[in-house]
Amino acid sequence: MPAIAPLASPPQSQEQLLAQARQLAGYSLGELAALAGIPIPRDLKRDKGWTGILLELWLGASAGSKPEQDFAALGVELKTIPIDSRGRPLETTFVCVAPLTGNSGVTWESSHVRHKLQRVLWIPVEGERTIPLAARRVGAPLLWSPDEDEERQLRMDWEELMDLIVLGEVERITARHGEVLQLRPKAANSKALTEAIGARGETILTLPRGFYLKKNFTAALLARHFLLQHD
């Protein structure tokens, strides 16, 4: 393979970003970590975001965990997605933290979820636990925007979930709500509480929530673009 190097500054165009991402396809995480001079953990138990951080480094990302997209100047969000040997997602995909208060007047068009999913660079990475972390390979990237049908599905779920939040029913929401988008606790520990609206309109303390794309949504998306068998 030709010698490659991390981008020293944020990419200037979507084409440059995609070209760099394509260069990473086929490399293992261990090879990319060594070339970038960063240590690789034994596993992801305590370093869950490590794969994303490594690829952000290679692609010149700028946003970190801020509300804007990873490549804010390009309007592109980076999402690494662990896949099995058949190219299917192994887990749900975090989109953004859900606002539990101050939601009067918020619409789908102005929502963080829509903003984050307007343009996404998906990078599949081997994720099966039988493969050592350093040996897991990076797959071919996909630069994606939701089509009309996908946007409709996302909007319907978002509106249903936000209605429940505004009506003070956040604690009734389960991961089963929503066809393609779900809401579930985001905190690493149960002591990190945040304010929300209770059933009688009072302020309550609850776990922070995050929006996640369900596996059926990302599986269909990958299958369609990479011509995989989707069942």
UniProtKB/Swiss-Prot annotation:
It is found in: Cytoplasm. The keyword Ribonucleoprotein does not apply. GO terms for biological process: DNA modification; mismatch repair. One of its GO terms (molecular function) is endonuclease activity. HAMAP family: MutH. Belongs to the MutH family. This is DNA mismatch repair protein MutH.
